[in-house]
């Protein structure tokens, strides 16, 4: 099941790895969009806001866990690249032990704090009940959400991006079917959306485990590999914690933006909730390129192929920037129709169009720093990604959105500019960091 990513044409290797990952990401976004579509058809602005706020909160938790799992992807990738499968087995076993413990504790804490979380994000009164119900159900499912994303991280470290695609395809089908049942037929609203999401994630974990056991591989995780080993856990956390914190900070910034929008009223709150969900969908390519760069670079770094690793970064970044330019032009042309497909309320469509047309420029600049962050993480330098993201959030994304929202109360267009400006700062920092480290030969060999 493991795949050698250290040979062959770089661009072709990127495409072969990235395309299944993109499809997996698309399918994950699809059933998130299905939730919003069904809520828009059967529930109205209050339901959209409840699911939008709840999904944004859950996404913070999910991406933080995924970021932490980056340590596993990189360590497993290093081991596969150097053909040390015993190290990969130990890393996988320790990851399972670590994340299952963390996810159970996290679920319990979040359930206890659910009312406070709903209040903290400034949920409009009309959407409080629905948001709380959505979050309680999703918090119960956190161990399953964590398990799926951990398994995906392990697959990527092994160079396999296809297996998660097959698994998530089944989960997506289940989720969409349940949305029609729970939201459309039974009228359960946000509760139905949450039940569909958690049930689909649970099914995906079960299927992934069955798939993993059925595949022939050089990796055989034994019970002894589950025993925590401080050195292994330290290696995983050294890479994963900065990535988790940086991803968490980005999502917290989005949550602050959601809070700002919530204080503007129900229409703007619904518009921002819709656009944020759509942006996740439109960012499939740069997000996929970031994961692709980390997986390919990890194996090539483990194999001592620094030049090939740098070529991976260059090609992936080119793909991301070209995509960003194309999608920006497209959204300027079709934003009203695109948003109108998910919302019938004309006021929500108008507000969302303005927000989308400024926010979408982020697709260009985010593609640059996401690829750099994946590259830095693969070389054990994930602290760089942490630093530039925290600076962008603290200096531009949040304060910029707040200031522009207050200055322009009649439109969301200026508020949307804050995100691409934050990504511009991140991109500049990444270019400087790469140039300095590359001149010092930091990417010529792997330093564990």
Language model region names:
Residues 1-18, 76-143, 185-241, 297-362, ...:
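Short alpha-helical transmembrane segments in multi-pass integral membrane proteins
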Residues 5-42, 56-71, 75, 100-107, ...:
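N-terminal transmembrane alpha-helices
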Residues 16-35, 137, 171, 200-204, ...:
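Transmembrane helical elements of multi-pass membrane transporters/channels
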Residues 26, 30-49, 118-125, 181-188, ...:
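Helix-terminus/linker motif at the lipid-water interface of multi-pass membrane proteins
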Residues 33-36, 108, 150-154, 173-181, ...:
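Alpha-helical transmembrane segments of multipass membrane proteins
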Residues 43-56, 135, 194, 266-281, ...:
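Small-residue hotspots at the loop-to-helix junctions and early N-terminal turns
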Residues 48-108, 145-164, 258, 271-335, ...:
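Small-residue-rich hydrophobic transmembrane alpha-helices
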Residues 69, 137-156, 164-172, 193-208, ...:
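Short runs within selected transmembrane alpha-helices of multi-pass transporters and secretion channels
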């Amino acid at each position: 099941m493991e795949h050698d990513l250290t040979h062959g044409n770089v661009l072709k290797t990127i495409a072969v790895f990235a395309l299944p990952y993109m499809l997996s990401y698309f399918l994950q976004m699809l059933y998130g969009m299905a939730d919003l579509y069904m809520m828009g058809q059967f529930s109205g602005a209050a339901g959209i806001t409840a699911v939008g706020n709840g999904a944004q909160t859950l996404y913070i938790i999910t991406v933080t866990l995924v970021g932490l799992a980056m340590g596993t992807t990189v360590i497993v990738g290093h081991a596969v690249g150097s053909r040390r499968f015993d190290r990969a087995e130990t890393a996988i076993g320790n990851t399972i032990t670590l994340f299952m413990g963390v996810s159970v504790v996290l679920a319990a804490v979040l359930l206890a704090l659910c009312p406070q979380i709903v209040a903290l994000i400034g949920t409009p009164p009309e959407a409080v009940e629905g948001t709380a119900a959505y979050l309680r159900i999703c918090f119960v499912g956190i161990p399953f959400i964590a398990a799926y994303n951990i398994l995906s991280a392990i697959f990527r470290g092994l160079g396999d991006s296809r297996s998660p695609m097959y698994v998530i395809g089944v989960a997506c089908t289940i989720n969409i079917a349940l949305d029609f049942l729970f939201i459309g037929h039974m009228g359960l609203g946000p509760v139905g959306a949450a039940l569909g999401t958690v049930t689909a994630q649970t099914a995906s974990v079960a299927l992934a485990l069955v798939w993993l056991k059925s595949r022939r591989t050089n990796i055989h995780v034994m019970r002894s590999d589950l025993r925590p080993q401080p050195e292994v856990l330290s290696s995983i956390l050294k890479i994963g914690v900065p990535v988790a914190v940086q991803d968490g900070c980005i999502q917290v910034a989005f949550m602050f933006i959601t809070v700002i929008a919530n204080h503007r009223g129900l229409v703007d709150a619904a518009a921002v909730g819709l656009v944020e969900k759509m942006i996740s969908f439109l960012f499939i390519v740069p997000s996929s390129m970031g994961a692709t760069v980390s997986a390919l670079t990890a194996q090539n770094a483990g194999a001592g192929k620094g030049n090939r690793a740098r070529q991976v970064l260059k090609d992936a970044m080119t793909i991301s920037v070209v995509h960003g330019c194309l999608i920006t032009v497209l959204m300027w042309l079709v934003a009203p129709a695109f948003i109108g497909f998910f919302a019938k309320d004309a006021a929500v469509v108008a507000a969302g169009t303005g927000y989308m047309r400024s926010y979408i420029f982020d697709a260009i600049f985010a593609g640059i720093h996401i690829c750099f962050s994946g590259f830095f993480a693969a070389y054990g330098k994930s602290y760089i990604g942490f630093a530039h993201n925290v600076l962008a959030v603290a200096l531009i994304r949040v304060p910029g959105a707040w200031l522009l929202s207050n200055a322009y109360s009649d439109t969301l267009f200026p508020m949307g500019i804050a995100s691409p400006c934050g990504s511009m700062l991140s991109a500049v920092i990444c270019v400087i960091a790469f140039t300095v480290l590359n001149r010092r030969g930091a990417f010529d060999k792997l330093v564990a």
